[in-house]
UniProtKB/Swiss-Prot annotation:
The gene is A407L. Interacts with the major capsid protein. Its main location: virion. InterPro entries: P9_TM. This is Minor capsid protein P9. Pfam families: P9_TM (PF19066). Induction: Expressed in the late phase of the viral replicative cycle. It comes from the Viruses. One of the minor capsid proteins that constitute a network internal to the major capsid proteins and outside the lipid membrane. The minor capsid proteins glue and stabilize the capsomers. The transmembrane regions anchor the protein in the membrane of the underlying inner membrane. Keywords: Capsid protein, Disulfide bond, Late protein, Membrane, Transmembrane, Virion. Disulfide bonds join 104-131, 194-201. It comes from Paramecium bursaria Chlorella virus 1 (PBCV-1).
Length: 210
């Protein structure tokens, strides 16, 4: 399955057009780069301040929003300047790898961690891999299914006494492992190597969509 490679957005004061490219991204997430988080916060402040200014009929709220944006941007600029790397390969820019959405085997009461059990394979030999635990909704569903009918200690707020260490999603959750993907993970893809093309070593931020 092909993947889509997306370069990270510059911060808004370097390219103002990025604010309008993704108007719906207003909540910073861990999958975003630092500049993309700043852009998301700027959009959120803009929307809120101008909405309140229109409702209250008071332009001072818009000015307050612009002041907050200026403070956030200044803090980002000063922080970026302090943490500037002295890496010799300073021309290499990280990029985000956005994985294509695909079907997955969801958690169930009989198989909370979506493992390739004998029963699961008998039901569907061509079952897709288990859904990613990085998905907050899926992680919550797995925990609920695992804890269903389980005698729990009410004082165990960190969930350390219910055998979570022994039960987890296995690396391979299909009938057969994907040896091609594993080989590419170990030795790289069939494309150029770092020696042939330095851009092949560009650091990446992996973003999971499903």
């Amino acid at each position: 399955m092909k993947t889509e490679t997306l370069y990270q957005d510059p911060v808004w004061f370097q390219d103002l057009s990025v604010i309008f490219k993704r108007p719906s991204e207003i909540i910073p997430t861990r999958d975003q780069s630092d500049s993309e988080r700043i852009n998301a916060m700027v959009r959120l402040v803009l929307y809120c301040s101008f909405a309140v200014a229109l409702i209250r009929q008071n332009y001072l709220y818009a000015i307050l929003g612009l002041a907050i944006i200026a403070i956030i941007s200044l803090a980002y600029a000063l922080g970026a300047k302090k943490t500037k790397s002295n890496e010799a390969y300073g021309n290499i820019r990280p990029y985000s790898v956005k994985r294509s959405k695909k079907s997955c085997s969801k958690s169930s009461a009989n198989n909370p961690f979506s493992n390739a059990t004998v029963g699961a394979l008998l039901d569907n030999e061509a079952r897709p891999p288990a859904c990613s635990y990085d998905d907050n909704d899926m992680a919550s569903t797995m925990r609920k299914n695992f804890n269903k009918g389980l005698f729990r200690n009410l004082d165990d707020v960190y969930e350390v006494e219910n055998s979570q260490r022994q039960f987890y999603t296995m690396p391979v959750t299909t009938a057969a492992p994907d040896l091609t993907a594993f080989g590419q993970f170990l030795y790289g893809s069939k494309g150029k190597t770092c020696k042939e093309d330095p851009s092949a070593c560009t650091p990446a931020f992996a973003t999971r969509d499903g």
